């Protein structure tokens, strides 16, 4: 019996280890596995562990030259998904040495790179990842984080207000800058480039940057508050992105923006490093996320993309509005909002959190609520998200019948009224409409906004932005 035993053998003989004790340094993954008919769940779970770590479809001679026990991924636990037929959660532990330090790109290439096309599976979804401190400490993380951002902006004790400039495509740079100025002058903290505003024929990036920064300075001098506009630096090459970021810095802009999924994690991490080194805040848009996270049984849950972003680096990230229709959605969204903001998050399956996550010293990221929200949602948003958030009203600002600046005034008055009411101990869930209506008596701008969008029912069941 010299040599090795060639041939195909079942994955579960090597990669299914139900008695494995996970190490503090292991990266842990929770996969939702839907096996093909006739494939036992243990084999499916082991196949995922194998194909996303050291395994291939057959035994190879060079297996003898490595220490499989040190390097293999292990499926250490499998449980059926309640209420779903033929779906299982497979827990996989990966040894730390399988991954390059400081590279989200390499982490994803390994864990979700190849295995999703695997024939033995009908579908596969990565639900959660546990990033151990030994790995997270190899990342810079967000350029600045929540506390440093508040200090830079000198804004405390309330959510920040933003607005995406619409129509998103077609405005000239000067008219675009005018819209920015009006919103900031009216009382918003930030305005935002839309995710697909890069550098198109109708508005080149350099012209936009100049007019927007002029708008920022004008609004700052008139209001005495620090203002910002998310200048979208996303471009076709990393070099071009850094060039745009450098120009923003030269102009004295406080914050730039990146589409991290279309731009890619490598580009995002480079940009985040540049931003920390040069004092720029970094706003992250999640364009393309639904391609990856919308299917319930295949792809990746957004909480994984959110964790990856906290490692790669960003100071703000879009995270849905939560004033959606489904109760469960709210808990799940708040689960990954906490994963973005807090240092330590306990395992809590009701909120979709499969693992206890300890971020050590990596700064927090501000969640951004945007999409179909307006002044009547303000009490719900204030209560749900708390102070550490950015509330973005695009149409809810620019759709005001009197124009952009009054739209901004309406939002700011509504927010300040909600924060004051909360600080006085009032119940925003029950008294929300009343608080907004009363504030409208002192602010004609808010009264006009209330009239346009009418009040909504306040079981927090408002707008469904899927």
UniProtKB/Swiss-Prot annotation:
Key words of the record: Calvin cycle, Carbon dioxide fixation, Chloroplast, Disulfide bond, Lyase, Magnesium, Metal-binding, Methylation, Monooxygenase, Oxidoreductase, Photorespiration, Photosynthesis, Plastid
EC numbers: 4.1.1.39
Active site, renumbered: 166 (proton acceptor), 285 (proton acceptor)
Any single Pfam family the record assigns to this protein: RuBisCO_large
Site, as annotated: Transition state stabilizer: 325
Sections of the chain in a coiled coil: none
Subcellular locations according to the entry: Plastid, Chloroplast
A Gene Ontology molecular function term of the record: monooxygenase activity
Sequence positions bearing N6,N6,N6-trimethyllysine: 5
CDD domains, A to Z: RuBisCO_large_I (cd08212)
Cofactor: Mg(2+)
Catalytic activity field: 2 (2R)-3-phosphoglycerate + 2 H(+) = D-ribulose 1,5-bisphosphate + CO2 + H2O; D-ribulose 1,5-bisphosphate + O2 = 2-phosphoglycolate + (2R)-3-phosphoglycerate + 2 H(+)
Residues where Mg(2+) binds: 192, 194-195
Keyword Acyltransferase annotated: no
Post-translational modification: The disulfide bond which can form in the large chain dimeric partners within the hexadecamer appears to be associated with oxidative stress and protein turnover.
Subunit structure: Heterohexadecamer of 8 large chains and 8 small chains; disulfide-linked. The disulfide link is formed within the large subunit homodimers.
Role noted for this protein: RuBisCO catalyzes two reactions: the carboxylation of D-ribulose 1,5-bisphosphate, the primary event in carbon dioxide fixation, as well as the oxidative fragmentation of the pentose substrate in the photorespiration process. Both reactions occur simultaneously and in competition at the same active site.
NCBIfam families tied to this protein: PRK04208.1
Family assignment from sequence similarity: Belongs to the RuBisCO large chain family. Type I subfamily.
Miscellaneous field: The basic functional RuBisCO is composed of a large chain homodimer in a 'head-to-tail' conformation. In form I RuBisCO this homodimer is arranged in a barrel-like tetramer with the small subunits forming a tetrameric 'cap' on each end of the 'barrel'.
Protein's name according to its UniProt entry: Ribulose bisphosphate carboxylase large chain
Protein's gene: rbcL
């Amino acid at each position: 019996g010299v040599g090795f035993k060639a041939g195909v053998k079942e994955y579960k003989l090597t990669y299914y280890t139900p008695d494995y004790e996970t190490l503090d340094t292991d990266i842990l993954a929770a996969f939702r596995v839907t096996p093909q008919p006739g494939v036992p769940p243990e084999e499916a779970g082991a196949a995922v562990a194998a194909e996303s770590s050291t395994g291939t479809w057959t035994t190879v001679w060079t297996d003898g030259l490595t220490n499989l026990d040190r390097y293999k991924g292990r499926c250490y636990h499998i449980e059926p998904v309640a209420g779903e037929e033929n779906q299982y959660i497979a827990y996989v532990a990966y040894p730390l040495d399988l991954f390059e330090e400081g590279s989200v790109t390499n982490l994803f290439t390994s864990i979700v790179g190849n295995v999703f096309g695997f024939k033995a599976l009908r579908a596969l979804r990565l639900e959660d990842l546990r990033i151990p401190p030994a790995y997270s400490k190899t990342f810079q993380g967000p350029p600045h984080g929540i506390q440093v951002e508040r200090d830079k902006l000198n804004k405390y004790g309330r959510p920040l207000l933003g607005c995406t400039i619409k129509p998103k495509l077609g405005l000239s740079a000067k008219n675009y800058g005018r819209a920015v100025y009006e919103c900031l002058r009216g009382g918003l903290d930030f305005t935002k480039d839309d995710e697909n505003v890069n550098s198109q024929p109708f508005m080149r990036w350099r012209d936009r940057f100049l007019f927007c920064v002029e708008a920022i300075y004008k609004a700052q001098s008139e209001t005495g508050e620090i203002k910002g506009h998310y200048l979208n630096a996303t471009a076709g090459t990393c070099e071009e992105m850094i060039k745009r970021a450098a120009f923003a810095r030269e102009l004295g802009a406080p914050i730039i923006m990146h589409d991290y999924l279309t731009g890619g994690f490598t580009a995002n991490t480079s940009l985040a490093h540049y931003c920390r080194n040069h004092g720029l805040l970094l706003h992250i848009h999640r364009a393309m996320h639904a391609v990856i996270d919308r299917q319930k049984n295949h792809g990746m849950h957004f909480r994984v993309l959110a964790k990856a972003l906290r490692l790669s680096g960003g100071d703000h990230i879009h995270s849905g509005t939560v004033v959606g229709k489904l109760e469960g959605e709210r808990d799940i969204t708040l689960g990954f909002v906490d994963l973005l903001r807090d240092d330590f998050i306990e395992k809590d399956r009701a909120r979709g959190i499969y693992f206890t996550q300890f971020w050590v010293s990596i700064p927090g990221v501000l969640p951004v609520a945007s999409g179909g929200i307006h002044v009547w949602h303000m009490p719900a948003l204030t209560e749900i998200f708390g102070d550490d958030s950015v509330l973005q009203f695009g149409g809810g600002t620019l759709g005001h019948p009197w124009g952009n600046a009054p739209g901004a005034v309406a939002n700011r008055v509504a927010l300040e009224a909600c924060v004051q009411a909360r600080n006085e101990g009032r119940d925003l869930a029950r008294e929300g409409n009343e608080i907004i209506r009363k504030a409208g008596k002192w602010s004609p701008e808010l009264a006009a906004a209330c009239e346009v969008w009418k009040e909504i029912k306040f079981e927090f069941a408002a707008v469904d932005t899927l």
